[in-house]
C-alpha cells in the first residue's frame, strides 16, 4: 500500500459457498433499529456567514458530536473484535471490519430457510437493529447514507458482489433483494478457469480500493467454490484538525521492549474521557464528515491485555456518552499495516455454526436440480489494512465468503500520549456502525 495524504482503511470480506440440504423460505426476521443522531449547528458560521440548516453538509466547519443513540450499540461487533484479539498472538497488529462481516451475514440470512437454525443464528448477529425499520431497510438507508457521505467527502466506499460459477442460477428473488436493499450485484464467471476468474475478481477489488488490495482471492479459492460473496470497504478520511508536528520517539511494546517510532502531536479541544472499568483513557479524533477514530489507551504500560479482556459494548457506549470536550495534548504514532484472517472458527465460537455444516439451510441462494438447497459456507476470509498519518487515515477491508458444493470543557490540558499498545475503532457516527476496529502492538510493524 502506498503512502497517501490521508487516513486510509480498506476491508475485504470473502465468503466461499458449497451445496447442501433443502429448506423453506428466504427472508430474515423483521427487526428494527433506532435512528442515529449526528447534529450540525444552525447558528452563524465564522465570519458572519448565514446560518446553514441541519444536514446541509457543513461538517468541515463545525463538529457537534452526539453519541449514536442506541440501546444496544452493536454487541456483536464488539464480541467479534474481542474474540479475534484474544485468539491472536499478543505481538500482532490487528484490524478487522465488523460492519463488513455483519453485512455479508445479513445477505446470507436473506437466503436462509424460514424458521431454521441457520436463520436464527444469522439473525442473532443483527440484534442491535431494533426500530420501525427492518434489517433490509436498515442496510438500504445505511448504504445510501454512505453514498451521500462519499459524494461530499469521497471518504467511504462500500461495494458488495456475488460472483458465481457460470453454471449456477441464483434465485431471482434473492438477486432482486440484494440489488434493491443491499446495493449488491451478481456476476457469473467461468470457475472452470480459476486463474482467469480470480484475475477478474482481483481487478474489481483493486479498482474499488484504488490499488490497495491487489489479491483478494487466489485460483484455489475459486477452484473449490461455486460462489464467492465479496464485500469491500474503502475509507480515506482527512482529520478535521490535522497534525502539524511530527517527531521521533519511543514506543513501549512492553516494559523491556521499546522501539523508535514516528509520532504526531497537537494540542486542541477534543472529546475525551476515562474508564475505570477499562482502566483506559478514551479519545475521539474526528475526520471531516461523519466518521471518527476512537483511541483506547490503557493506563498501564502493560495494560493492553486487561483492556481487551474487559472490552464490553455497554461500557464503551457509557464511555462515549460521558465524553466531554476538553483541551488535550495528543501524541499519536503513525501506523501502517495489513492483516488477514479466516473468521470461520471465530464465528463458530460466537454461535454462527450452521452455515458451515452440511445441515445448513440456504435455499434462497440458488435454483436448479444440481445445487438448489445444496450449498454451505466453507470459509469467511477477511483482509484489511490501515494507514494513519498526520493528514488523516486510509483504511480498507474486504470479506470473502466461499460457498462450495456440499458434495464437493476544562481549562486544564489532558495528556494523551499513545506510546504503548492500544485499541482503536472507526465509527460512522450517524448510524453507529463500527467500520474498522483493531489493536496496535507495534506502529512500525506492517505484519
UniProtKB/Swiss-Prot annotation:
<feature type="glycosylation site" description="N-linked (GlcNAc...) asparagine">
    <location>
        <position position="207"/>
    </location>
</feature>
<comment type="similarity">
    <text>Belongs to the serpin family.</text>
</comment>
<dbReference type="GO" id="GO:0004867">
    <property type="term" value="F:serine-type endopeptidase inhibitor activity"/>
</dbReference>
<dbReference type="GO" id="GO:0035006">
    <property type="term" value="P:melanization defense response"/>
</dbReference>
<dbReference type="GO" id="GO:0045861">
    <property type="term" value="P:negative regulation of proteolysis"/>
</dbReference>
<keyword id="KW-0722">Serine protease inhibitor</keyword>
<keyword id="KW-0325">Glycoprotein</keyword>
<dbReference type="GO" id="GO:0098595">
    <property type="term" value="C:perivitelline space"/>
</dbReference>
<keyword id="KW-0646">Protease inhibitor</keyword>
<dbReference type="GO" id="GO:0050832">
    <property type="term" value="P:defense response to fungus"/>
</dbReference>
<protein>
    <recommendedName>
        <fullName>Serine protease inhibitor 27A</fullName>
    </recommendedName>
</protein>
<dbReference type="GO" id="GO:0160035">
    <property type="term" value="P:negative regulation of Toll receptor ligand protein activation cascade"/>
</dbReference>
<dbReference type="GO" id="GO:0035009">
    <property type="term" value="P:negative regulation of melanization defense response"/>
</dbReference>
<dbReference type="GO" id="GO:0009953">
    <property type="term" value="P:dorsal/ventral pattern formation"/>
</dbReference>
<keyword id="KW-0732">Signal</keyword>
<dbReference type="InterPro" id="IPR042178">
    <property type="entry name" value="Serpin_sf_1"/>
</dbReference>
<dbReference type="GO" id="GO:0005576">
    <property type="term" value="C:extracellular region"/>
</dbReference>
<dbReference type="InterPro" id="IPR000215">
    <property type="entry name" value="Serpin_fam"/>
</dbReference>
<dbReference type="GO" id="GO:0002213">
    <property type="term" value="P:defense response to insect"/>
</dbReference>
<dbReference type="InterPro" id="IPR042185">
    <property type="entry name" value="Serpin_sf_2"/>
</dbReference>
<dbReference type="GO" id="GO:0050776">
    <property type="term" value="P:regulation of immune response"/>
</dbReference>
<dbReference type="Pfam" id="PF00079">
    <property type="entry name" value="Serpin"/>
</dbReference>
<feature type="site" description="Reactive bond">
    <location>
        <begin position="406"/>
        <end position="407"/>
    </location>
</feature>
<dbReference type="GO" id="GO:0048149">
    <property type="term" value="P:behavioral response to ethanol"/>
</dbReference>
<comment type="function">
    <text>Serine protease inhibitor that functions in embryonic dorsoventral patterning and the melanization immune response. Regulates dorsoventral axis formation during early development by inhibiting the serine protease ea/easter, and is therefore important for restricting activity of the Toll signaling pathway to the ventral part of the embryo. Also plays an essential role in the melanization immune response to both physical wounding and septic infection using certain bacteria and fungi.</text>
</comment>
<dbReference type="GO" id="GO:0005615">
    <property type="term" value="C:extracellular space"/>
</dbReference>
<dbReference type="InterPro" id="IPR023796">
    <property type="entry name" value="Serpin_dom"/>
</dbReference>
<dbReference type="GO" id="GO:0140540">
    <property type="term" value="P:negative regulation melanotic encapsulation of foreign target"/>
</dbReference>
<comment type="subunit">
    <text>Interacts with Sp7. Interacts with ea/easter; the two proteins are covalently linked leading to inhibition of ea catalytic activity.</text>
</comment>
<dbReference type="InterPro" id="IPR036186">
    <property type="entry name" value="Serpin_sf"/>
</dbReference>
<dbReference type="GO" id="GO:0035011">
    <property type="term" value="P:melanotic encapsulation of foreign target"/>
</dbReference>
<keyword id="KW-0964">Secreted</keyword>
<feature type="glycosylation site" description="N-linked (GlcNAc...) asparagine">
    <location>
        <position position="87"/>
    </location>
</feature>
<dbReference type="GO" id="GO:0009611">
    <property type="term" value="P:response to wounding"/>
</dbReference>
<feature type="signal peptide">
    <location>
        <begin position="1"/>
        <end position="25"/>
    </location>
</feature>
<dbReference type="InterPro" id="IPR023795">
    <property type="entry name" value="Serpin_CS"/>
</dbReference>
Amino acid at each position: 500500500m502506498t503512502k497517501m495524504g490521508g487516513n486510509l482503511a480498506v476491508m475485504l470480506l470473502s465468503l466461499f459457498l458449497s451445496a447442501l440440504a433443502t429448506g423453506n423460505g428466504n427472508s430474515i426476521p423483521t427487526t428494527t433499529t433506532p435512528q442515529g443522531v449526528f447534529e450540525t449547528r444552525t447558528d452563524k458560521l465564522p465570519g458572519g456567514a448565514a446560518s446553514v440548516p441541519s444536514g446541509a453538509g457543513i461538517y468541515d466547519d463545525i463538529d457537534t458530536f452526539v453519541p449514536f443513540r442506541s440501546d444496544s450499540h452493536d454487541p456483536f461487533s464488539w464480541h467479534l473484535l474481542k474474540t479475534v484479539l484474544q485468539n491472536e498472538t499478543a505481538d500482532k497488529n490487528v484490524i478487522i471490519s465488523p460492519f463488513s462481516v455483519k453485512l455479508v451475514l445479513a445477505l446470507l440470512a436473506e437466503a436462509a430457510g424460514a424458521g431454521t437454525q441457520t436463520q436464527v443464528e444469522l439473525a442473532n448477529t443483527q440484534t442491535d437493529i431494533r426500530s420501525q425499520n427492518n434489517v433490509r431497510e436498515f442496510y438500504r438507508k445505511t448504504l445510501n447514507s454512505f453514498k451521500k457521505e462519499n459524494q461530499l467527502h469521497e471518504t467511504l466506499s462500500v461495494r458488495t458482489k456475488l460472483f458465481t460459477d457460470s453454471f449456477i442460477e441464483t434465485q431471482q428473488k434473492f438477486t432482486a433483494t440484494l440489488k434493491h436493499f443491499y446495493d449488491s450485484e451478481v456476476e457469473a464467471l467461468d470457475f472452470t478457469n480459476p486463474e482467469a476468474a480470480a484475475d477478474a475478481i482481483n481487478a474489481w477489488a483493486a479498482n474499488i480500493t484504488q490499488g490497495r488490495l491487489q489479491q483478494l482471492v487466489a485460483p484455489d479459492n475459486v477452484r473449490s467454490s461455486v460462489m464467492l460473496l465479496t464485500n469491500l470497504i474503502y475509507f480515506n478520511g482527512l482529520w478535521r484538525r490535522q497534525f502539524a508536528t511530527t517527531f521521533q520517539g519511543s514506543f513501549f511494546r512492553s516494559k523491556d521492549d521499546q522501539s523508535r517510532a514516528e509520532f504526531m502531536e497537537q494540542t486542541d479541544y477534543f472529546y475525551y474521557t476515562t474508564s475505570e472499568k477499562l482502566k483506559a483513557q478514551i479519545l475521539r479524533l474526528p475526520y471531516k464528515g461523519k466518521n471518527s477514530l476512537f483511541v483506547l489507551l490503557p493506563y498501564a504500560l502493560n495494560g493492553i491485555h486487561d483492556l481487551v479482556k474487559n472490552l464490553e459494548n455497554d461500557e464503551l457506549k457509557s464511555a462515549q456518552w460521558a465524553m466531554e470536550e476538553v483541551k488535550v495534548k495528543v501524541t499519536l504514532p503513525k501506523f501502517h499495516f495489513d492483516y488477514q484472517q479466516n473468521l470461520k472458527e471465530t464465528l463458530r465460537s460466537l454461535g454462527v455454526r450452521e452455515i458451515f455444516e452440511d445441515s445448513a439451510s440456504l435455499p434462497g441462494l440458488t435454483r436448479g436440480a444440481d445445487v438448489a438447497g445444496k450449498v454451505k459456507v466453507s470459509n469467511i476470509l477477511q483482509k484489511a489494512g490501515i494507514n494513519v498519518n498526520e493528514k488523516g487515515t486510509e483504511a480498507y477491508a474486504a470479506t470473502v465468503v466461499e460457498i462450495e458444493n456440499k458434495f464437493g470543557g476544562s481549562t486544564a490540558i489532558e495528556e494523551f500520549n499513545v506510546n504503548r499498545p492500544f485499541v482503536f475503532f472507526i465509527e460512522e457516527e450517524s448510524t453507529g456502525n463500527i467500520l474498522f476496529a483493531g489493536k496496535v502492538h507495534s506502529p512500525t510493524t506492517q505484519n
